[in-house]
Amino acid sequence: MGLPWYRVHTVVLNDPGRLLAVHIMHTALVSGWAGSMALYELAVFDPSDPVLDPMWRQGMFVIPFMTRLGITDSWGGWSISGGTVTNPGIWSYEGVAGTHIVFSGLCFLAAIWHWVYWDLEIFSDERTGKPSLDLPKIFGIHLFLAGVACFGFGAFHVTGLYGPGIWVSDPYGLTGKVQAVNPAWGAEGFDPFVPGGIASHHIAAGTLGILAGLFHLSVRPPQRLYKGLRMGNIETVLSSSIAAVFFAAFVVAGTMWYGSATTPIELFGPTRYQWDQGYFQQEIYRRVSNGLAENLSLSEAWSKIPEKLAFYDYIGNNPAKGGLFRAGSMDNGDGIAVGWLGHPVFRDKEGRELFVRRMPTFFETFPVVLVDEEGIVRADVPFRRAESKYSVEQVGVTVEFYGGELNGVSYSDPATVKKYARRSQLGEIFELDRATLKSDGVFRSSPRGWFTFGHATFALLFFFGHIWHGARTLFRDVFAGIDPDLDAQVEFGTFQKVGDPTTRKQAA
């Protein structure tokens, strides 16, 4: 037939049986990939340190999605929260991976069956005997079924009525666990960080989908609308389906990058805006201030800061620090975090506490500047030592650590003080193991960054696909120069069935 690569899908244009077959095969590929990817990730995943080496530092992509839906245990005997389990049952990580692979195999067989037995009675128009699909009716059926699934997820799975619930955490990603969620029916349900909105929105959207599906099953479209929107043309379905997919892709790119209850930081890592706004730094200082108000010493107050919270306040966990072509996990970049060294407090010889100005997200290098509590520059690491007035040596800066591994240790020699000042630009200071994975020291993005980039990119491409196929179906008669209602369609790409020798042709 000699079709160019970009037109090969026209072979299923007027062939409902094989159109169904290729879609079932596509589902087989997607499900098979998901199951296989899950098994691969489980093979390389190290669950031993959920605090300093969580799934998102290891570059896991599908494990976080399973976890947010309620899967926490492995047949390997470990739990995502760090404990051990004895009988995880079928709904473990491996169980879910296996069910996807089994489902993929069944879809593969179903696709072959439908490819071989393509000429089914159900696809024929009773009056004409030609292949035909009642697209408005099919739309109603799919809308109804999608509504049932949506309602069921919100009313049963999320609420724990029949299911595990979903991953819920505190605003600082410290206490996350899978739990049942009650629907939020008030204004708070529209807050993207309130988990109850997930339940209520699925229940509401599912109800709407069920009602809309029943409407489209019981009410036929007016003839003018049917013809105007080309409801009899399968390319109309393609165009509107692409629209639904690219819209969803744009939405999830936003909820992933900006953060929401659906993308917990314990599973996908923090967002770049939490670094930009000093989100974790403010919480750490608030906790230290509260500790001091309770008559704790500075050392005791800092020692009470959870290592998990301190680790979030480190620029290496900012998903915007990765480069576009830097493949690999965060652990392959700056290394595997081993321990928190503690919080360094810098002071000049007058005893003023100095604060290192932190590196903004999009800088690779940044001057080391130390300011006092009023924001006045008191010390720096100069570029030109001959002209310096505020060098660490001249100002007499010292550093003392509170909390962490170096708790109570102080340094006054300039070389060491400058080393820790430079590291303080990057947030809290951690010991990182770069030898195990041969990490190169160059920051990588988290799965949050990869997911956002992929979905935003494909959403843009699919947007153009929607425009392209929408224009083709709306203006088919103009483009082809024929009346779409003619019985004999002989223009290329508009045969009743591609390659069908029975299509009437004009005499040469």
From Swiss-Prot:
In terms of one coarse class, where is the protein primarily found? plastid
TM region positions:
21-36, 101-115, 140-156, 203-218, 237-252, 457-472
What the record notes about the co-factor is: Binds multiple chlorophylls. PSII binds additional chlorophylls, carotenoids and specific lipids.
Q: Name one GO molecular function term.
A: electron transporter, transferring electrons within the cyclic electron transport pathway of photosynthesis activity
Q: What does this protein do?
A: One of the components of the core complex of photosystem II (PSII). It binds chlorophyll and helps catalyze the primary light-induced photochemical processes of PSII. PSII is a light-driven water:plastoquinone oxidoreductase, using light energy to abstract electrons from H(2)O, generating O(2) and a proton gradient subsequently used for ATP formation.
Q: What quaternary structure, including any partners, is listed in this protein's UniProt entry?
A: PSII is composed of 1 copy each of membrane proteins PsbA, PsbB, PsbC, PsbD, PsbE, PsbF, PsbH, PsbI, PsbJ, PsbK, PsbL, PsbM, PsbT, PsbX, PsbY, PsbZ, Psb30/Ycf12, at least 3 peripheral proteins of the oxygen-evolving complex and a large number of cofactors. It forms dimeric complexes.
Q: Can you say what this protein is called?
A: Photosystem II CP47 reaction center protein
Gene field: psbB
